[in-house]
Amino acid sequence: MSKVEKKKLLIYAHYYIPDTASTGQILRELAEGMLDKFDVTVICVVPSYLGTVEDEYKTQRFYRESINGVKILRIRVPEFSKTNTVSRIKNILTYFFGAMIATFKVGKQDYVFSISQPPILGGLLGVWGKWMKHAKYIYNIQDFNPEQVLAVNFSKNKLITGAMMFFDKFSCRRSDLIITVGRDLVQTVHNRFKGKKVPKTVMINNWIDENEIYPVETNHPKVAAFKEKYGLQDKFVIMYSGNIGLYYDLENIMKVIEQVKPGTKTADGREVVFAFVGAGSVLDKLVVYKEEKHMNNVVFIPYQDKADLIYSLNAGDVHWCVNAKGIKGVSCPSKYYGIAAAGKAVLAVLEKDSEIRCIIEETHGGLCSEPGDYEAIAENLKWFIENAGTDKVDEMGKRSRENLVQNLTRDVSVKKYAEEILKL
């Protein structure tokens, strides 16, 4: 008997490997993890996450590739600067219209899958794919817009935010299934459609590959080399790892950190150091603040290659997991998964009932406080400094890792995605 032909799945990814965008990583693992059930094609940009494009991707409009069994159609986009809004918009619109054209180059598709990136446009691409391919449409919402824009007062223009809401609700209504990544995000879908028919929605947690990020001894040569390079050896390292951007209230967190004076020691005699690993739109402001206030106990470290992430995460003793007020129900801090995978305690600043705070409280994986409650944040910080090196802190990290291995692995979540899509 001939082998049953696999159903065809088209993914609009925006970014895809080798780009390091977190959504690109998740979609790679999702696409590769579902190859046993689907014939997968990805439409995405040429590698360009940091703004530059290699010469090999500058000559054609489209590039066909295959990575680990996934078919890829890449769209050439212009280079951009993260600080230049016009170049950014031009870059995103080139992808959007390029992806619409690319849709005609991938043949018949049974399912179309799109994420909420770029904001609003990702959802609309999925609707376009559904119509052009007469396919079932799955809308994967990683973060809600305009809710995210409104939460941080990025735009108060009611015309713009109203149009964004109109179009994204349109994408939700046209979908056959919405998959989102937290209990609080499911609630947001319900809030959007109060009193009206709510589109079919399920929640599937994001994940991390637990075999790629895991606890490593502090004296591991690569962890030791990382610590030495950035002056962290023999220190108690409170780390923030990830995007240093708008949605994390980091400028105010710096004011809390300032209360811990350089030279402060933990109960077990180590000097306390705050390490920020990453980059983003707020980084320069934090650097200026550090210099002005002579905060010699704060270090800024550039993004690490994905292969080295395990060592940088393990160099932290405690990790910040923070969101600004208003982000509950809007997005889910994916950095939590890396912290839990490395088996580290969490210093969380997250709203009550947000997905990640629920997980941290359910597993007793760290200490939580509300965004904006700087006294409580300072108290929790003080607790970690006073309890450094004790079993209490170690056990928090161990519990987080155990829960992750049982419930938040790639295999568990990818299996759920495949099951939900095939039910349609």
Task: List the predicted regions and their residue ranges.
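Carbohydrate-associated surface elements
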Residues: V46, D184, I204-W207
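Conserved donor-binding/catalytic core segment of Leloir-type glycosyltransferases
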Residues: L232-Y248, M254-E258
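N-terminal subdomain of nucleotide-sugar transferases
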Residues: M1-N68, V260, T264, D411
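Nucleotide-activated donor-binding/catalytic signature segment of Leloir-type glycosyltransferases, i.e.
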Residues: T264, G269-E271, V277-G278, L283-D308
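A short helix/loop element that forms part of the nucleotide-sugar donor recognition site in Leloir-type
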Residues: K58-Y63, Y214-G231
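A short, well-ordered alpha-helix in the C-terminal region of glycosyltransferases
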Residues: K392-N407
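Nucleotide-sugar-dependent
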Residues: Y248, V298, D305-Y311, H319-A340, ...
